[in-house]
Design a protein with these regions (language model features):
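Active-site loop/oxyanion-hole signature of alpha/beta-hydrolase fold enzymes
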Residues: 94-130
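Catalytic histidine-centered segment of alpha/beta-hydrolase-like enzymes
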Residues: 285-298
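Short beta-strand/loop motif that positions the catalytic acidic residue
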Residues: 247, 253-255, 259
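Conserved HGGG/HGGXW glycine-rich cap/lid loop of the alpha/beta-hydrolase fold
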Residues: 46-101
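Conserved alpha/beta-hydrolase "acid-adjacent" motif
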Residues: 260-266
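Conserved alpha/beta-hydrolase catalytic His-Asp/Glu region
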Residues: 186-230, 234-238, 243
């Protein structure tokens, strides 16, 4: 009788463990950017907030650095979920952005230092970078400041220091914010997409995706920190060119062919100045070309990261 009880007990334990493993696997398979939890880590008195997808994937994580005025809620879910199928991908609010308190730095170099501090706080010694727009500026600085930290980088909708038209981002941003107020549209409709049928449709789809997350949304960007970001971008546009030939890592650069914010000429410039680079230019697309062509971009990004 005791043996029977012991066998039943062992079977119960085994079944419980199996059920727990299945439950854990199901949670992983259903985890998307729509429902992934927001975490935080304290570094030097600053509490950095972040979201991590694809944590079950082995290998080097991808750190996503986003655009001007962007909190974690401005990450495109299709790109985040797409990359997370094969890699761990982490987005975060840098200092003064969204839920992360403090003053946003007024230089790209300082923003890069903050990003590196965050990456090291998570315990990573090697990462891949995916930077869009302002995030692409920051990614370049990280590559130059601490090259040993980076395995590969993807630079999208971005340009080098002193690049063509970058000094005009502040003016373009304010104009399109005003356009948005008068038309009752999100300014990204104008900033990121062409004003033809393809662009308008892509803008609507993109903005709808940004609203898929209903609970535990991020805090809004404060105007004063938006202004500080714009000051940093303006300074980047006026800055002397950097020596990008010292970047030895594989780099993928991508943009739309009609980018009003960071003209596509900067994309070609990056690809020429970074020796080990590949380039993708999306036709009939603006600054948000990777959002308009999100499926194609994810395929290209995964292929690049897998090489």
């Amino acid at each position: 009788m005791k043996k029977n009880h012991s066998l039943l007990f062992l079977m119960f334990i085994a079944i419980s463990k199996l059920a727990a493993q299945n439950d854990s696997a199901n949670k992983i398979s259903t985890m998307t950017f729509q429902n992934v939890k927001t975490e935080s880590i304290s570094v030097g008195g600053t509490e950095f907030y972040y979201r991590k997808l694809g944590a079950h994937n082995p290998g080097i994580p991808v750190i996503f650095l986003n655009h001007l005025a962007a909190t974690m809620d401005n990450c495109d879910p299709r790109i985040m979920d797409g990359i997370a199928k094969e890699h761990q991908i982490i987005c975060f609010d840098n200092r003064g952005v969204g839920a992360t308190k403090g003053k946003t730095p007024e230089t790209i170099a300082e923003m890069a230092i903050d990003a590196r501090t965050f990456i090291h706080a998570l315990g990573y010694e090697k990462v891949d970078l995916l930077g869009f727009s302002l995030g692409g500026f920051i990614s370049q600085e990280i590559l130059l400041q601490e090259p040993q930290l980076i395995r590969k980088a993807i630079l999208t909708g971005t340009g080098p220091a002193g690049g063509e038209g970058i000094k005009n981002v502040t003016k373009i941003t304010y104009i399109d914010i005003i356009r948005g107020l008068f038309s009752f549209k999100d300014a990204k409709t104008y900033l990121f997409f062409n004003r033809n049928e393809n662009g308008k449709r892509s803008a609507k789809e993109f903005l709808n995706r940004l609203n898929e997350r209903r609970e535990n949304r991020d805090k809004k960007m404060k105007i004063v920190n938006l202004q500080r970001q714009l000051k940093a971008i303006h300074a980047w546009g006026l800055q002397a060119a950097q020596d990008l030939s010292i970047i030895k890592q594989p780099v993928l650069v991508a943009n739309g062919d009609n980018d009003r914010m960071v003209p596509c000429s900067n994309t070609y410039d990056l690809s020429k100045r970074i020796a080990n680079s590949e380039i993708i230019v999306y036709k009939d697309a603006g600054h948000g070309g990777i959002f308009q062509y999100n499926e194609q971009f994810v395929r290209s990004a995964l292929s690049f990261l897998a090489k």
